[in-house]
Amino acid sequence: MKNVLSIQSHVVFGYAGNKSSTFPMQLSGIDVWALNTVQFSNHTQYGKWTGMVVPHQQIPEIADGIDAIGELKNCDAVLSGYIGSADQVAEIVKVSHLVKTRNAAALYLCDPVMGSAEKGCVVADGVREGLIDIALPQADIITPNLLELRELSGLRAENFEQAVIAAQHLLTKGPKTVIVKHLGSAGKYPGKFDMLLANREGVWCLSRPLYPFAKDPVGVGDLIAGLFLANLLNGKSEPEAFELTGNAVNDVMEITHKLNSYELQLIEARHAIMAPQNRYKAEKIA
């Protein structure tokens, strides 16, 4: 069994951060060591929430505790997502380094959540800069959305061709693999939910239906990052992991839409996560 140290947000109600990625990774046969960056009542896109940011010192303290009992060497990957403070960024990267000293084959997947005023996703000051300056160069895999792709690359990425160039540019910044979780307005196919995979072997696009939610559910990016990492650790090639992830997430979104839910319906979709319908193919474009 593979083990992932997942350093993300926790919400008591609903699904985002570790609540969105842990259960699907477990369904995929991965043991998840969840370390929370914040504990909130609910995700920030409700517009109001209660809770706290975890003190940044606790992140290395927890990792050191796992190391002290001799288990950190069994960690196969570090996954980071929503970060609660600028100080947490450096601590998370230090933890990824510690894990790699204990297991040289371990991966670091950074899901660079930067927030969006338009969507109501609130991220602390300094996190964006920390992700660009500290996390990006150290990540093996980076999984931005379109806005984050623009911020990380410094390129416009206003259309599909520009998004491909921006993703390829990120490969020169440190990561070996780039997943653009949602191309949005820069998608290849209008009216679809398009994702992109770029690595040194090529570029792939996967297009699936875009479901007409009254309010788009939160936590989809967390789900994508977690499932892609789980599929990789289960021995799939990157294009295979990308395709499996896209199909599993589509099934989750289809079920969530049918139930008219603002929160991801991961429990209802559990069987689909374990055995997704392989309806949508990853198209190699470069």
UniProtKB/Swiss-Prot annotation:
Family from the record: Belongs to the pyridoxine kinase family. PdxY subfamily.
A GO molecular-function descriptor: magnesium ion binding
Binding locations of substrate: 9, 44-45, 222
Source taxon at top rank: Bacteria
Enzyme Commission designation: 2.7.1.35
Entries under PANTHER family matching the protein: PYRIDOXAL KINASE
An individual GO BP term: pyridoxal 5'-phosphate salvage
Listed name of the protein: Pyridoxal kinase PdxY
Keywords, alphabetical: ATP-binding, Kinase, Magnesium, Nucleotide-binding, Transferase
